[in-house]
């Protein structure tokens, strides 16, 4: 806090002592020293006032002591001056004697002779002047002392105000601190309550879990869940084994079906309907296919004896692969209208054209001599009037059912003048459809992680 000190106590604004011509140089020096000391005391006054009332009391006591000392000095100096004046008024003594003799002579001589009326009047006037000067000095010192007291009082008042303000601020700070202490205590209490509630809740939950009768069931369920992955692994291994066994069996069956059988041409029966061409009359391979719901994908018609050497079964495996993959249709097949909603298109018509004679297969193995004789007995017909037969093989490797308006089958022609009749083409369509369906069913890969 800043304390404004009254400037009236400045010594420069105070009037100077009246001039004293008769005063010697020593009292002037003493006055200067006294003024300097008073200025120092006033300059030190604010700092001492800031420190406290103890400093003010010390300063006042020191100033009073200095004033008393100065008064004593002035009184002693004035006495000396008065004695000197009195001695100057007396006649000079020319005789040089010791001090004891002078004192004895002074005491012995009468004072009445030496004092005159004029000297007494002058001494009175001088004494009165000196007294007036002393009274004036006392007044000035008292006035200065009063001004010092006034300045000290103002400083004390300011210090009291500052202390009051500080006290008020400290009281406010104490109130704030008390509020903060109360809030902290409330927070601590709330924390303790929350901890106690949480501990109680946790204990209650643990007790409920411990008292739960379904704990054994939960343990059993956990054990079952832990055993589930092992069971799944064992089941997957079993399924893999079964799938491998089934695939191997099916592959073996397909390989056995694809192996060629010995085929012998048999004389055809006249005017046989398509219903008589049952799977029981087609051989053992057809029976296996019907039992597995996988019809034979080959359509074979008995060929003339001249084309016997062109059979793919007699050429070996290389000729078979070439006949299946490398040859394509040389003649355009007739396009048949296909209606999926029409049931007559799916079934084979029971009637045949009267000009065609279709025979059925029989498991008869005649001797070679008889076959040669029969071949020689038959006359050779011209190309225009001979019976038209064909040895063809159909490939079912592709899934596309419509290429250029027909089926994606490959036919290996071995004779001239081949011609498909209406009922034979429909039968091949039906066989191809069933074969592709079965292939799609069994051909989809099964991925097991």
UniProtKB/Swiss-Prot annotation:
Knockout consequences: Drastic decrease in chiasma formation at metaphase I associated with an absence of synapsis in prophase, due to the inability to make double-strand breaks (DSB).
InterPro entries recorded: PAIR1 (IPR034546)
Nuclear localization signal (motif): residue ranges: 437-441
Gene Ontology CC terms: nucleus
Biased composition (Low complexity): 28-50
BP term (GO), one: meiotic DNA double-strand break formation
Alphabetical UniProt keywords: Meiosis, Nucleus
Compartments where found: Nucleus
UniProt keyword Isomerase, yes or no: no
Nucleus listed as a keyword: yes
Residue numbers spanned by region Disordered: 21-56
Subunit structure: Interacts with PRD1; this interaction facilitates a binding to DFO.
Described purpose of this protein according to its UniProt entry: Involved in DNA cleavage that forms the double-strand breaks (DSB) that initiate meiotic recombination.
PANTHER family xrefs: RECOMBINATION INITIATION DEFECTS 3-RELATED
Protein name stated in the entry: Putative recombination initiation defects 3
Organism of derivation: Arabidopsis thaliana (Mouse-ear cress)
Organism lineage string: Eukaryota, Viridiplantae, Streptophyta, Embryophyta, Tracheophyta
């Amino acid at each position: 806090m800043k304390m404004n000190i009254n400037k009236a106590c400045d010594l420069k604004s105070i009037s100077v002592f009246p001039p004293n011509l008769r005063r010697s140089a020593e009292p002037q020096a003493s006055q200067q020293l006294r003024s300097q000391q008073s200025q120092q005391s006033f300059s030190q006054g604010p700092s001492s006032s800031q420190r406290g009332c103890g400093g003010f009391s010390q300063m006042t006591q020191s100033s009073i002591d200095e004033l008393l000392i100065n008064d004593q000095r002035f009184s002693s100096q004035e006495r000396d001056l008065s004695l000197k004046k009195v001695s100057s008024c007396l006649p000079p003594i020319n005789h040089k004697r010791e001090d004891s003799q002078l004192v004895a002579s002074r005491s012995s001589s009468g004072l009445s002779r030496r004092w005159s009326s004029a000297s007494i009047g002058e001494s009175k006037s001088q004494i009165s002047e000196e007294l007036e000067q002393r009274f004036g000095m006392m007044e000035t010192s008292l006035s200065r002392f009063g001004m010092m007291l006034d300045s000290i009082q103002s400083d004390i008042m300011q210090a009291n105000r500052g202390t009051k303000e500080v006290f008020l601020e400290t009281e406010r700070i104490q109130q704030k601190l008390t509020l903060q202490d109360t809030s902290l205590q409330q927070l601590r209490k709330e924390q303790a309550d929350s901890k106690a509630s949480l501990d109680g809740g946790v204990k209650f939950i643990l007790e409920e879990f411990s008292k739960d009768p379904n704990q054994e069931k939960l343990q059993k369920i956990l054990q079952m869940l832990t055993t589930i992955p092992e069971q799944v692994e064992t089941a997957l291994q079993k399924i893999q084994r079964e799938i491998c066994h089934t695939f191997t069996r099916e592959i073996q069956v397909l390989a056995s079906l694809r192996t060629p059988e010995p085929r012998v041409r048999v004389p055809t029966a006249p005017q046989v309907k398509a219903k008589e061409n049952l799977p029981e009359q087609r051989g053992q391979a057809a029976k296996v296919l019907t039992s597995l719901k996988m019809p034979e994908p080959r359509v074979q018609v008995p060929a003339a004896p001249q084309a016997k050497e062109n059979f793919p079964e007699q050429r070996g495996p290389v000729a078979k692969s070439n006949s299946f993959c490398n040859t394509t249709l040389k003649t355009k097949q007739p396009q048949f209208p296909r209606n999926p909603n029409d049931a007559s298109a799916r079934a084979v018509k029971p009637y045949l054209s009267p000009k065609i004679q279709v025979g059925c297969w029989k498991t008869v193995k005649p001797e070679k001599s008889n076959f040669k004789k029969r071949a020689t007995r038959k006359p050779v017909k011209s190309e225009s009037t001979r019976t038209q037969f064909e040895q063809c093989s159909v490939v079912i490797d592709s899934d596309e059912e419509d290429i250029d308006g027909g089926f994606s089958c490959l036919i290996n022609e071995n004779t001239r003048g081949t011609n498909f009749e209406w009922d034979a083409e429909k039968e091949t369509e039906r066989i191809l459809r069933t074969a592709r369906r079965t292939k799609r069913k069994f051909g989809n890969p099964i991925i097991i992680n």
